[in-house]
Each structure stands twice: as structure tokens, then as C-alpha cells.
């Protein structure tokens, strides 16, 4: 009976770890998506820098666009969260984007390390569970 209890404990632990793995993977995907958005923003700003007066397409929703003329590319209005946006000059905006990307890449790396640690623990627990399962099945016959 002792083996049965230990097996149940390990299976419960494995289930908890599996849930953590799935959650971390989802969070990592969200971070990757944000990094990708920042890279697109960075490229777009680089492409329009100094192109005052040029025509561009502006998204207005539902996959629709209108033509617009760039008036001033020296300043960027950036969201800082909680519905708040601030005006930054071009250089500060680019620096802010790079800083955010670096922070997110560091976070992604830490998440990857946590994922590896949990996976390592699971790899150690799985053989224990298999061994206990064999014992429990063997004693039950």
C-alpha cells in the first residue's frame, strides 16, 4: 500500500509540473509575440525616419486601411501602459524599444531556464513512477 501512495504522490506532482510547463510555454509564446511586435515597430520607425510628406497606409480596423501623409517623423507617441501614451523624440523611442526588447529577451531566457528545470524534475520522477507502477501491478496480481 505504501508503494501505491507514493505512486499517487508522484503522479500528482507530475500533473502539477505538467500544468506549470504548459503555463510557462503559453507565457513564452506571449513574450515572443511581444518581441515580434517590437521588432516590427523598430523596422517601421526606421523605414519612415526622415520621410516627412511621404504617403503611407494607416490601419483603421478589420483589415482596412486609409492613405495618409506623414507630417512629422521626428516624434513618436508611445504607449506606456494603462491607457497612457507619451511623446518621445525618434532616438528616445528607438532606445525605449531596444530596452523593452532586451528586457523581454532576458525574461524569455529565464522562463526557458525554469522550463528546463521543471522538465529535468519530471524526467527524474517519471522513471520512479514507472517503477512503482510495476511494483503495484506485480503485487496486485
Curated annotation (Swiss-Prot):
Whether S-adenosyl-L-methionine counts among this entry's keywords is no
Q: What keywords does the record list, in alphabetical order?
A: Chaperone, Cytoplasm
Q: Which CDD domains match?
A: Prefoldin_alpha_GimC
What is the superkingdom listed in this entry's lineage?
Archaea
Q: Where in the cell is it found?
A: Cytoplasm
GO CC, any one term: cytoplasm
Any single biological process term in GO: protein folding
Q: Which Pfam families match?
A: Prefoldin
Which InterPro entries does the protein's record reference? Answer: PFD_alpha_archaea, Prefoldin, Prefoldin_subunit_alpha
MF term (GO), any: unfolded protein binding
Q: How does it assemble?
A: Heterohexamer of two alpha and four beta subunits.
- Family, as annotated: Belongs to the prefoldin subunit alpha family.
Described function: Molecular chaperone capable of stabilizing a range of proteins. Seems to fulfill an ATP-independent, HSP70-like function in archaeal de novo protein folding.
What name does UniProt use for this protein?
Answer: Prefoldin subunit alpha
Give the originating organism. Methanothermobacter thermautotrophicus (strain ATCC 29096 / DSM 1053 / JCM 10044 / NBRC 100330 / Delta H)
